[in-house]
């Protein structure tokens, strides 16, 4: 099987490149020139990005199958028992919680990775990477817990304030309705 070849040259000073149609790769006549290394790196990046985008799309469809139970479990006729709406809402809640947990994990991993790199630059090389990783993860967990605690304190304080305001409004409402109903009947009656 003979492959058709085409020779490309961009200028007279650069080495010629050969495109082999069977493999769709550029092959340089001088294998270790700067242009050939640059082209190889560029095509590798292009191939990696194409491969990663196709794997992402495959993962997306696989995760959809996991959430929806595969293609063979779809019901054509709706259920008559009346519980299907509740089940769908419960599945929706579970999937949204699952997505939230996945998002938080990915954010934690990204922040942890950046923090580990920054701390390794600052700390001496004698410290083990496992110790640095443990310390960074612990500090990030404690920080996220303290932020969560502060957020919950704010929510609880707002809830307590709203509850107190509602009680005061009900107290004033009850007092106003009492005075409207009975008037001044509980005090001394003036002589007519």
From Swiss-Prot:
- Please give the tissue specificity annotation from the record for this chain: Expressed in young seedlings (e.g. hypocotyl and cotyledons) and in green tissues (e.g. leaves, stems, sepals, and young siliques).
Query: Taxonomic lineage per UniProt?
Result: Eukaryota, Viridiplantae, Streptophyta, Embryophyta, Tracheophyta
Ligase in keyword set: no
Q: What does this protein do?
A: Negative regulator of photomorphogenesis modulating both light and abscisic acid (ABA) signaling pathways. Negatively regulates the light-mediated inhibition of hypocotyl elongation, probably in a PHYB-mediated signaling pathway, but promotes flowering time (especially in long days) and lateral root formation. Enhances light-regulated gene expression. Promotes COP1-mediated degradation of HY5 during seedling development (e.g. hypocotyl growth) through enhanced ubiquitination in the darkness. Also involved in root gravitropism.
Region of interest (Disordered), residue spans: 70-92
Domain of life according to the entry: Eukaryota
Q: Which GO terms describe its cellular component?
A: nuclear membrane; nucleus
Q: Subunit arrangement?
A: Interacts with HY5 and COP1 in the nucleus.
* Upregulation: Induced by white light (WL). Barely detectable in dark and in various wavelengths of light such as red light (RL), far red light (FR), and blue light (BL).
The residue numbers the entry assigns to motif Nuclear localization signal are: 43-50
Biological processes annotated in GO? abscisic acid-activated signaling pathway; flower development; negative regulation of photomorphogenesis; positive gravitropism; positive regulation of lateral root development; positive regulation of long-day photoperiodism, flowering; regulation of abscisic acid-activated signaling pathway; regulation of anthocyanin biosynthetic process
Q: What is this protein called?
A: Protein SHORT HYPOCOTYL IN WHITE LIGHT 1
Keywords in alphabetical order: Abscisic acid signaling pathway, Flowering, Membrane, Nucleus, Transmembrane, Transmembrane helix
Phenotype when the gene is knocked out = Short hypocotyl in dark with drastic reduction in apical hook curvature. Enhanced inhibition in hypocotyl elongation in white light (WL), especially at lower fluence rates. Delayed flowering under long-day conditions. Reduced lateral roots formation. Reduced chlorophyll accumulation and expression of light-regulated genes. Increase in the anthocyanin level in the dark. Reduced sensitivity to abscisic acid (ABA) leading to impaired ABA-mediated reduction of seed germination. The double mutant shw1 phyB exhibits a strongly reduced hypocotyl length in WL.
Q: What InterPro entries does UniProt report for this protein, alphabetically? A: SHW1 (IPR039324)
């Amino acid at each position: 099987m003979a492959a058709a070849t085409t020779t490309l040259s961009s200028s007279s000073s650069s080495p010629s490149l050969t495109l082999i149609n069977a493999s769709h790769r550029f092959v340089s006549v001088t294998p270790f020139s700067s242009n050939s290394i640059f082209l190889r790196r560029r095509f590798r990046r292009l191939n990696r990005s194409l491969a990663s985008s196709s794997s992402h799309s495959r993962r997306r469809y696989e995760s959809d199958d996991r959430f929806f139970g595969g293609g063979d479990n779809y019901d054509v006729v709706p259920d008559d028992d009346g519980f299907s709406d509740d089940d769908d809402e419960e599945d929706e809640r579970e999937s949204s919680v699952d997505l939230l947990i996945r998002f938080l994990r990915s954010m934690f991993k990204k922040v942890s990775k950046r923090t580990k790199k920054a701390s390794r630059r600052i700390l001496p090389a004698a410290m083990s990477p496992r110790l640095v990783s443990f310390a960074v993860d612990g500090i990030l967990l404690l920080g996220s817990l303290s932020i969560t605690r502060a957020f919950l304190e704010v929510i609880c304080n707002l809830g307590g304030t709203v509850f107190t305001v509602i009680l005061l409004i009900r107290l004033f409402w009850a007092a106003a309705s009492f005075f409207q109903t009975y008037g001044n009947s509980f005090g001394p009656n003036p002589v007519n």
